[in-house]
Amino acid sequence: MNKQIFVLYFNIFLIFLGIGLVIPVLPVYLKDLGLTGSDLGLLVAAFALSQMIISPFGGTLADKLGKKLIICIGLILFSVSEFMFAVGHNFSVLMLSRVIGGMSAGMVMPGVTGLIADISPSHQKAKNFGYMSAIINSGFILGPGIGGFMAEVSHRMPFYFAGALGILAFIMSIVLIHDPKKSTTSGFQKLEPQLLTKINWKVFITPVILTLVLSLGLSAFETLYSLYTADKVNYSPKDISIAITGGGIFGALFQIYFFDKFMKYFSELTFIAWSLLYSVVVLILLVFANGYWSIMLISFVVFIGFDMIRPAITNYFSNIAGERQGFAGGLNSTFTSMGNFIGPLIAGALFDVHIEAPIYMAIGVSLAGVVIVLIEKQHRAKLKEQNM
């Protein structure tokens, strides 16, 4: 594997490992500092909101100043965020840590996505994005496990560990990452508003809407999953860990071994539509499942559809972006963060109304995504006929 690709994958893995580390440790912080569930919600939302605001600037600056520089700045911010959380003893410090962490993700994500697109041959781009999505998934899987294990020693240890990894990733990036000779900055040599008018914004409307809608539905489901299974079939933390880990492993395997093969036979939009329909069917089965093993088995396969959609959308963004890979990566990260910010807030309120309501929400959002894809496919077909 190309050394640069390996380092980029490591950086992405680090960011999402750091996000996952927080999950088992935050309740301990809440108890120590006397914080409430609302405070926990604010800490989670602060990260997503910060990433959402910073991502478009991170993407544009990556195109202008170089993706390596933006990635390195993001990694330094990541380490600062983790060390702040490790030493924090009041809510204000923890909140500032999460804001800085969101800024870090908002710089690293578009920088890495754009650089992978730049250095990947066209025939390997879909495969490399599939690997990237699998690595993101792996970070989410391993993060809570590592965080929970280290918390047995000290609930602050996971954050020191993540901060140290950030420094290591920064050093590796300085030494091993090089911006490609061919620049993808045309139109962004100066950060002037009128230059944005040169972008064909209509091209990005459908992927932006899809990204927002799908991240909203997916985050709503994933955020409430542990509470849902605990209330429905009395899953213990161990059961939930097995279900999430199993689902994550299956999702990662499909991304690594099957995603690029599917991309040879389907367009991104067609593949996204079929993945959404698969997810709808599995979510409906989850609603009707009431036994321990039936829900466990469904949990192993429920994430496959969502995990296949992520790299498909990333690849779709890349293919329509042309020489604006950093800009497209910034848009992708921005609207993913927006969905990750809004989804859990809505799902939490719905869960208080009815235990199945967040699942219904995810089903409705997935069906809406299918409709959006079909409308876009018809629109493209008409444009193709007009150009013939």
Curated annotation (Swiss-Prot):
Region forming the signal peptide: none
UniProt subcellular location: Cell membrane
Residue ranges of the TM segments: 5-25, 42-62, 69-89, 99-119, 129-149, 157-177, 201-221, 239-259, 269-289, 293-313, 331-351, 355-375
Location (main, coarse): membrane
Tree of life domain: Bacteria
Keywords (A to Z) from UniProt: Cell membrane, Membrane, Transmembrane, Transmembrane helix, Transport
Gene3D superfamilies: MFS general substrate transporter like domains
Topology with respect to the bilayer: Multi-pass membrane protein
GO terms of molecular function: xenobiotic transmembrane transporter activity
Gene Ontology CC terms: plasma membrane
Functional description taken from the UniProt entry: Involved in quinolone resistance. May constitute a membrane-associated active efflux pump of hydrophilic quinolones.
Family: Belongs to the major facilitator superfamily. TCR/Tet family.
NCBIfam families reported for this sequence: 2_A_01_02
Protein name per UniProt: Quinolone resistance protein NorA
Species per Swiss-Prot/TrEMBL record: Staphylococcus aureus (strain MSSA476)
